[in-house]
C-alpha cells in the first residue's frame, strides 16, 4: 500500500497516514538515516511516549514511530473486524519499503515484538523488549466464545457505571506509583496521553490484537536467533523465561524505575538500547 506522506516544515520529520486493512489508516512519523528502527508504544498511550527517544535515536538510525490502530491519531477499530497489531506493523514496514528493522517495544509494544519474534523473525535486525513478555493466552485463531462475550459485556457495563474518567485516573496512578525516585516526572506526559485516549478497547468487543498463543507456539519451536535484549524494571524477580528460547538473548534489570522506564530514566534507557543495537 502506498503511504500518504507529508513533510513537516519545521523539522526533518516525515509524517503521514498509511492505509491498512478494514479501511483504517495508521499515523506514523519517520526521521533520520541509517538502519531502520521502529518504536512500538504501550496500551492507552501513543507515539508521544517515545519523545525522549525519537530525536536521539534519529541521530544514528532511520526511526519510525506510529500509533497502533485504536490509539493516538490512527483509526479506531471496527467491532467484529479481526486484525492484529503485528499485521499493522508489517503493513507500515511494507508501505515504507522497510525489509528489516530493529524493533523496540514497551509493554503492549513488547507483546507485539514477541509476536514478531515468533511469526516474522526474518524481518527483525534486533529486538528490545521492555516491560513486556511473550503472551500465551488465546490468539486470533480461537474466536471469542459466548462465555468470553458475557464476561466482556459485564466488564463494559461495570466500566460505564464506574466512569471512564475514574478508570483513567486509576490507570495513571498505577503507572506513576510503580516508578522510582523520578516517578513524578512522568505524571504530566502520561496524564496528557491517557486523557486523550478514547478508551475504545475496554468499551468494545476488541478483537484478539495480540497473536499470543499463535505466536508463542512458533517462538518455542523456532528458538529465533535474532539478537534480543529484554529489559525489566526494579520490581522484576528472576530472569525472564523467554531467555531459554533465545540463543542471542540478553537481560538487564533497570533499578530505580518502574513500568515506564523509557520516560522515567531516558538517558539510561537510551544508552542501553543504543549500545545493544550498535553491538549487533
Task: State each model region's role.
Residues 249-280:
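Catalytic active-site module of serine/aspartate enzymes centered on a nucleophile-bearing elbow/loop
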Residues 154-159, 166-182, 204-210, 231:
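Helix-loop "lid/cap" segments that line or gate small-molecule binding pockets
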Residues 118-119, 124-160:
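Flexible "cap/lid" loop of the alpha/beta hydrolase fold
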Residues 195-247:
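Conserved serine/cysteine hydrolase catalytic core
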Residues 112-116:
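Hydrolases whose catalytic domains are alpha/beta-hydrolase-1, hotdog thioesterase
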Residues 21-75:
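Conserved HGGG/HGGXW glycine-rich cap/lid loop of the alpha/beta-hydrolase fold
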Residues 31, 52-55, 65-108, 263, ...:
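Active-site loop/oxyanion-hole signature of alpha/beta-hydrolase fold enzymes
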Amino acid at each position: 500500500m502506498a503511504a500518504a506522506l507529508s513533510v513537516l516544515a519545521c523539522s526533518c520529520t516525515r509524517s503521514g497516514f498509511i492505509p491498512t486493512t478494514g479501511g483504517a489508516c495508521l499515523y506514523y512519523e519517520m526521521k533520520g538515516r541509517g538502519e531502520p528502527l521502529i518504536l512500538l508504544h504501550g496500551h492507552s498511550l501513543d507515539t508521544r511516549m517515545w519523545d525522549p527517544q525519537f530525536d536521539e535515536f534519529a541521530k544514528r538510525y532511520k526511526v519510525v514511530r506510529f500509533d497502533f490502530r485504536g490509539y493516538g491519531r490512527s483509526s479506531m477499530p471496527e467491532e467484529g473486524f479481526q486484525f492484529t497489531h503485528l499485521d499493522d506493523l508489517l503493513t507500515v514496514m511494507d508501505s515504507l519499503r522497510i525489509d528489516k528493522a530493529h524493533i523496540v517495544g514497551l509493554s503492549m509494544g513488547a507483546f507485539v515484538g514477541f509476536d514478531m519474534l515468533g511469526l516474522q523473525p526474518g524481518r527483525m535486525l534486533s529486538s528490545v523488549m521492555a516491560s513486556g513478555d511473550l503472551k500465551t493466552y488465546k490468539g486470533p485463531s480461537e474466536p471469542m466464545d459466548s462465555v468470553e462475550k458475557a464476561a466482556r459485556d459485564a466488564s463494559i457495563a461495570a466500566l460505564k457505571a464506574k466512569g471512564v474518567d475514574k478508570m483513567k485516573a486509576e490507570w495513571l496512578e498505577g503507572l506513576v506509583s510503580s516508578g522510582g525516585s523520578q516517578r513524578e516526572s512522568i505524571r504530566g506526559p502520561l496524564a496528557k496521553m491517557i486523557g486523550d485516549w478514547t478508551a475504545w478497547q475496554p468499551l468494545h468487543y476488541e478483537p484478539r490484537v495480540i497473536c499470543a498463543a499463535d505466536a508463542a507456539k512458533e517462538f518455542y519451536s523456532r528458538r529465533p536467533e535474532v539478537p534480543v535484549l529484554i529489559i525489566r524494571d526494579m520490581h522484576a524477580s528472576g530472569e525472564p523465561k523467554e531467555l531459554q528460547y533465545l540463543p542471542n538473548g540478553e537481560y538487564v534489570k533497570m533499578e530505580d524505575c518502574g513500568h515506564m522506564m523509557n520516560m522515567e530514566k531516558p538517558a539510561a534507557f537510551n544508552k542501553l538500547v543504543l549500545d545493544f543495537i550498535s553491538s549487533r
